Amino acid sequence: MSRYTGPSWRVSRRLGVSLSGTVKELARRAYAPGDHGRDRRGKLSEYGTQLREKQKLRFMYGMTERQFSNLFVRAGKIKEGTHGANFMALLERRLDNMVYRLGLATTRRQARQLVNHGHITVDGKRVDIPSYEVKVGQIIAVRDKSKNLDIIKNAVEAVVSRPSYVDFDADKLEGKLNRIPAREDMNADIDEALIVEFYNK
């Protein structure tokens, strides 16, 4: 299954969650798109509830189904912690997400584009793979020739707060993951237990 590249607001309204993180797409119409979206949400089956939770998280991180399910399998091989919490931590450590968490982009989609276009380095080396797994202590920075991009400067200026598991130097436009993200650090609107149940059927 390919990555969805259409309007994020349509998916946000269908799933009832802000994919951009700005919640603007839900501010006016917090129901599914279409003329009868307001009336279409009936009671979901157990499977439907699990599927929707999985889709919410997958679209939130902008991943294909194959990427998402492969990462889920990897999380299950980690011996410490729960499967769901480990999965969430691996998602958070994706390079595109870390660029977003550091405040170098206003959305994950924008962060993914910055990585794809070669504007980001890890420990001084350019990395253009959004799924790159960031390790604790690695330095994520904007390339020197990209530091004057308005898209980056505007994003940094708009930051209100950053997660406690990242450090950021605004002067150098660089930061790092200072520890593995704990479950309580992450999105409370996601019930990862439903996703574990979905894949374990």
Curated annotation (Swiss-Prot):
It comes from Limosilactobacillus reuteri subsp. reuteri (strain JCM 1112) (Lactobacillus reuteri). GO terms for molecular function: rRNA binding; structural constituent of ribosome. Belongs to the universal ribosomal protein uS4 family. This is Small ribosomal subunit protein uS4. GO terms for cellular component: small ribosomal subunit. Residues 93-156 form the S4 RNA-binding domain. It comes from the Bacteria. Part of the 30S ribosomal subunit. Contacts protein S5. The interaction surface between S4 and S5 is involved in control of translational fidelity. Keywords: Ribonucleoprotein, Ribosomal protein, RNA-binding, rRNA-binding. InterPro entries: Ribosomal_uS4, Ribosomal_uS4_bac-type, Ribosomal_uS4_CS, Ribosomal_uS4_N, S4_RNA-bd, S4_RNA-bd_sf. One of the primary rRNA binding proteins, it binds directly to 16S rRNA where it nucleates assembly of the body of the 30S subunit. With S5 and S12 plays an important role in translational accuracy. One of its GO terms (biological process) is translation.
